Amino acid sequence: MAKQVSPGVLALRKVVDDVHKEAREAKARGELVGWSSSKFPCELAAAFDLHVMYPENQAAGIAANRYGELMCQAAEDLGYDNDICGYARISLAYAAGVRVSRKYDPETGEYIIDPSTGKPLKDADGNVVMGEDGKPKKDPKTQTPYLQLDNLLEIEKLPDGPEKEKRLEAISPIRQMRIPQPDFVLCCNNICNCMTKWYENIARMCNIPLIMIDIPYNNTVDVHDENVKYVRAQFDKAIKQLEELTGKKF
């Protein structure tokens, strides 16, 4: 019997699927789509009706789908040290256009199946079907192709045609591999210091605006007025940047 998924989990999946779908559709319409750190004040983006995706969540999803090692290695091949966190490495590789892709035969277009994948094939009575070699047969419906890395930015430069179509199709269909490239980035570094350079690198790599909220370290119970003024001034600057980016008034 298949495992039952709770209504709450199904509802949350729909919320996430809808957010991803809306971002892809917005990008296709030519609207701005940004990437945001999880602690950036989301109300600012919402006030300007901006579509925002979250690289930290994306990186966790990529890792949960067992693509983390491939993406981390890709980031290291780009020159990033393996001492920085896996979230950052996965995101930086993705920002550079790296995508996990299903391997296929260029001549036939058929995907090349990894024999180590797939669930045991079962008969109508639910019994595992055994092969002549004495091992369980694999259900072909659950087998998956070998994985390789491709680069979306290189694919997009190709002329329209079968090769371009196939390479786009071969990119892993999980939603975390289909997040649009960013038009701007929103960063707040009150989680960790890595955030600052992570998002600066995305902005530099993609040649897009970075809107930054730098949170000063507070080592006392009380919050000093100077710190409040410092953060408030950055909110004012962020609003001005978003006005210039969108052409809208706050």
Regions found by a protein language model. Name each.
Residues 1-250:
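An N-terminal assembly and electron-transfer interface module characteristic of large anaerobic redox
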